[in-house]
Design a protein with these regions (language model features):
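A conserved ligand/cofactor-binding region detector
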Residues: 1-242
């Protein structure tokens, strides 16, 4: 059973191994990163103690890897949602709620001398969208995962976000980059085996036979990242690829 001592042990392990830090120099940001990595472990392969109706506790496996394996074996019809914007919200709090582990993580984090609410605010919102379109796209993924539907969401991973709005001293509105990846994103899973050449600019040239060949321009290498979307107390995991 995943208990509070197991959670604190997992967090401490990430502090020492993933972050290469020790208790004497650990601040709220470091504690958040370690706790978030611990929560990601639970979304990947571990077990969570759940209480669906606050009456009957049951023990269910919430396993990202098993979700993908089950889809591969059963070959169901899949849906792929491509959207230029996603307003995902903060992943850490959402993950703890949907795993049914928020109270245990709160207690475990307090035993380490930190406060869960202080850590939650350290997560930067994924600057991948705003407004109704972005939130609707995020709701599609949350709902699909909760209903155990094989849905994948795809978008662009904006390094500096779409933009952030600032107010100048004279009261005018300013637009500036949003460096939301300044401290990286502990919930991302880089897929170094999935890379694509993306070409900007250039021109299309006709060859013999009428074929068009793109030439010139600037070429960049795009790397894929996955982010797990936990369903509301469900074993299913949708995937968000950027």
């Amino acid at each position: 059973m995943l208990d509070v001592p197991s959670i604190t042990k997992s967090i401490v392990n990430h502090v020492q191994t993933s972050l290469s830090r020790q208790a004497y120099n650990l601040d709220d940001l470091g504690a958040y990163e370690a706790a978030a990595l611990s929560a990601k472990d639970n979304m990947l392969v571990r077990l969570a103690d759940l209480d669906r109706n606050e009456r009957t506790a049951h023990f269910a496996q919430l396993n990202w890897n098993e979700t993908q394996l089950a889809y591969t074996r059963k070959q169901p019809k899949r849906a792929y949602y491509l959207c230029i914007e996603y307003l995902m919200g903060r992943t850490f709090d959402n993950a703890l709620l949907n795993l049914g582990l928020k109270d245990k993580y709160r207690e475990g984090i307090e035993k380490l001398g930190f406060n869960l609410e202080d850590l939650l605010v350290k997560e930067r919102d994924a600057a991948l969208g705003n407004g109704g379109l972005g939130r609707l796209a995020a709701c599609y993924l949350d709902s699909s995962s909760s209903q155990e539907l094989p849905v994948w969401g795809y978008s662009l991973r904006y390094k500096y976000g779409i933009f952030q709005q600032l107010i100048a001293p004279d009261g005018s509105q300013l637009e500036a980059p949003d460096p939301w990846l300044e401290h990286l994103n502990p919930f991302e899973i880089p897929r170094y085996d999935i890379q694509y050449d993306v070409r900007f600019y250039g021109q299309a040239e006709r060859t013999t036979g009428g074929r068009a060949v793109w030439s010139g321009g600037q070429e960049v290498l795009a790397l894929a990242y996955d982010v797990m979307i936990p369903g509301n107390i469900q074993p299913n995991r949708s995937r968000f690829g950027v």
